Amino acid sequence: MKDIKHGSFQGTSWSKEGTGSPVILVHGLGINRQMWQWQIESLSPNFSVIYYDLLGHGESVNPEIPCQLSQFSSQLLTLMDGLNLECCALVGFSLGGLIVQEFALNHPEKVNTLVLLNTAHGRTKSERKEVLSRVQQAEEHGPASTAEAALERWFSTEFSAKNPDIMDKIRSWIKANDKYIYPKIYRLLAECDESLKDSISDIRCPTLVMTGEDDRGNSPEMSQRRAALIPNARAEIIPGLRHMGLVENPEAFNSRLVSFFQEVFR
């Protein structure tokens, strides 16, 4: 029987599985900590895996308005303090990747390694305009209006057709978002990569940057540019996958995560 612990600390709902060096998983916009269910089984035999709901997501409280990246960084710090963690590995997906970069810059002593999955970096004006158009759609029509296009960006057509249950699950996560808070956090996602791009060269911990070959919004080029800026980083591009490749082909991501952590923690 799995030893799974759940808790809530100062408005943040979290779960913990496994034993060993601590690894904290930080999810992306519009979903929740359950997105990591495809990674837990691979990571928990060797690591203490902690995953939580971001502010405004899942079972955690809403953020203050206006939303700022610093709020989400502070949430992570509060959680680490509440769990008595002095230092850990951080894995961030999409918005989560932006959050853990911010955290690593502000609290370098608390991060021993960093993994950035499918995370935007230095968008062009046209790329940012495209994301902001989706923000406007969410503002005018609510989270549900963004769901179908998101699933198309996130998964291959073949995988979507063969896995309707997974599509329904993730669709329900998107639709469950607060219609007022969701667009506010979406706007943060659309804009905050700009504030980070010139400072990430100060990140010194070992860093793995990964994305899918076909993740158009968080492209291989973005990952390669980011990895070139961070002194102790490398980029890996996973063939044939879109934004949520870690769900479509978990093993492709999980094997690389485990190998990287074993290399860092040995």
What are these regions (language model features)?
Residues Q101-N106, V111-S145:
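Flexible "cap/lid" loop of the alpha/beta hydrolase fold
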Residues I203, V209-T211:
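Short beta-strand/loop motif that positions the catalytic acidic residue
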Residues A233-R266:
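Catalytic active-site module of serine/aspartate enzymes centered on a nucleophile-bearing elbow/loop
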Residues E213-N218:
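Acidic catalytic loop of the alpha/beta-hydrolase fold
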Residues Q71-C88:
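Conserved acidic catalytic loop of the alpha/beta-hydrolase fold
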Residues K125-K129, A144-S201:
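Conserved alpha/beta-hydrolase catalytic His-Asp/Glu region
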Residues T12-N62, L79:
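Conserved HGGG/HGGXW glycine-rich cap/lid loop of the alpha/beta-hydrolase fold
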Residues M1-V23, P45-F47, V258-R266:
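Alpha/beta-hydrolase fold catalytic core
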